[in-house]
């Protein structure tokens, strides 16, 4: 039996469907979890995370699986190439995965595939990275800024390509309306 719609957190495809208040709540919760890990050590007890990697990443794998374990849950990891997703019927695979787990995190090559997941999941879905967005990286960066400077009200300079990180930074700072983002891109 799945939770009622209003009890399911929003899918984290990017920041478009999140308000500044919702993003701030996520950051506040993350800060509290870091400060009081014992308070959350059973928060996800009995919950199962499915991690799917089309794009490899040691850091993404370890951060999600360690986090899930520290919160009392379990995880199942799969590489895209070792899954039935490669057979070309992703919607039926998405539905099957949703019947067996409580949350999905996928690091995928194309944003279109992330959107396909977002349109078809019945459990919360987190975009671990795609060619257009990298929301989890930006949340981690924002948390570090808050820890080091006390707030997001900083001048932030991004130097690099206009890529998924840049897109998510622009989206995040536009939502939060705190601080100033400067970008030097080729």
Where are the predicted features?
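Residues at the C-termini of beta-strands that transition into short coil/loop
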Residues: 16, 129, 185
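Glycine-rich phosphate/diphosphate-binding loop of Rossmann-like nucleotide-binding domains
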Residues: 54-66, 148-186
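Positively charged, low-complexity intrinsically disordered leader regions
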Residues: 9-62
